[in-house]
C-alpha cells in the first residue's frame, strides 16, 4: 500500500495475536516497526504514563500509531467487582489514552500522522459477559471520533477497526472455559455470513489501509471486520 515504506510505526500489544499480524504486515511494506508490549524488549506497560513517555521519546518521530493492546475476561457483570473493572479500564481505555497523549503532540508538531485504534464490535452492539470491556471499547471509539474532529486540520487521521469473532488466544481461552469448544466454534462459524471466523491477518489488512496514503480522506470512522456478523450503516 502507498506511503508506508520507511514510516516509524508503533504497535501496542504487538507481541502476539492480532498485534503480531499487524507488525508483520507493516514490516512487509517496509515500515520501521516498534512494539510497545509487556513481552517486548524493552517491555512497555501502556498503563504507566511515565513508561509510555520514555518509550515514545526513545522511538523518535512516530508517523503511525496502532493502539492494539487489550485484555478481557468473560464474566457476567454482577459477578465482577471494582478491582476487575479497574484492570479492564487501565488496559483498554486508560492505556490507549496514555499512548495517544504522548504520541499526538509530535504528530501535531510535524503536521501529519495516522492513528488506528483496535476496538471491538462489543463497543458498538454490546456483548454478554463483557460489560466493562464493551464500555472501554465504546469509549475508545468515542475518543477517536473526538480527536479526529480536534486534529483534522493538523494533518492527523484517526480511525477505528472493530474485529468480529477472530481466532486469537483470548477467544480460544473463552471457548475452552465454556466447555465443548469445537461445538462452540462451529456455532460461531455458522453465525458469520461469510462462513468462517476471522484471522488476525484479516484485521491487519484493514489497519494497513487506514494507515496508508490511500486513506488520507478518511478520519473519525469505525470499520467492522467481522465477516458480516455485524453490519452498520
Residue map of PLM features:
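Active-site loop immediately N-terminal to the catalytic Tyr-X3-Lys motif
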Residues: 78, 123-131, 153-154, 195, ...
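Alpha-helical segment proximal to the catalytic Tyr-Lys
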Residues: 105, 149-153, 216
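Short C-terminal tail/terminal secondary-structure segment
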Residues: 125, 208, 219-233
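Short, flexible catalytic-loop segment of classical short-chain dehydrogenase/reductase
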Residues: 158, 163-173, 177
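Residue(s) in the substrate-gating loop at a strand-loop-helix junction
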Residues: 120
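Substrate-binding pocket helix/loop in short-chain dehydrogenase/reductase
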Residues: 76-77, 84-89, 188
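Active-site helix of classical SDR
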Residues: 100, 136, 144
Amino acid at each position: 500500500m502507498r506511503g508506508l515504506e520507511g514510516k516509524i510505526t508503533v504497535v501496542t500489544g504487538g507481541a502476539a495475536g492480532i498485534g503480531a499480524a499487524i507488525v508483520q504486515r507493516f514490516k512487509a511494506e517496509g515500515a520501521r516497526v516498534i512494539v510497545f508490549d509487556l513481552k517486548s524488549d524493552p517491555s512497555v506497560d501502556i498503563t504507566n504514563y511515565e513508561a509510555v513517555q520514555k518509550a515514545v521519546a526513545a522511538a523518535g518521530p512516530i508517523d503511525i500509531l496502532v493502539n492494539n493492546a487489550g485484555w478481557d475476561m468473560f464474566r457476567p457483570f454482577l459477578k465482577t467487582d471494582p478491582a476487575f473493572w479497574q484492570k479492564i479500564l487501565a488496559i483498554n481505555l486508560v492505556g490507549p489514552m496514555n499512548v495517544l497523549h504522548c504520541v499526538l503532540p509530535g504528530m501535531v508538531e510535524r503536521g501529519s500522522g495516522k492513528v488506528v485504534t483496535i476496538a471491538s464490535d462489543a463497543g458498538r452492539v454490546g456483548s454478554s459477559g463483557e460489560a466493562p470491556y464493551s464500555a472501554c471499547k465504546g469509549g475508545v471509539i468515542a475518543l477517536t471520533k473526538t480527536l479526529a474532529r480536534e486534529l483534522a486540520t493538523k494533518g492527523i487521521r484517526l480511525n477505528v477497526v472493530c474485529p468480529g469473532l477472530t481466532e486469537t488466544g483470548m477467544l480460544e481461552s473463552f471457548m475452552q472455559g465454556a466447555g465443548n469448544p469445537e461445538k462452540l466454534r462451529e456455532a460461531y462459524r455458522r453465525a458469520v455470513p461469510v462462513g468462517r471466523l476471522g484471522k488476525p491477518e484479516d484485521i491487519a489488512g484493514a489497519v494497513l489501509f487506514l494507515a496508508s496514503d490511500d486513506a488520507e480522506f478518511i478520519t473519525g470512522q469505525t470499520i467492522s471486520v467481522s465477516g458480516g456478523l455485524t453490519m452498520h450503516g
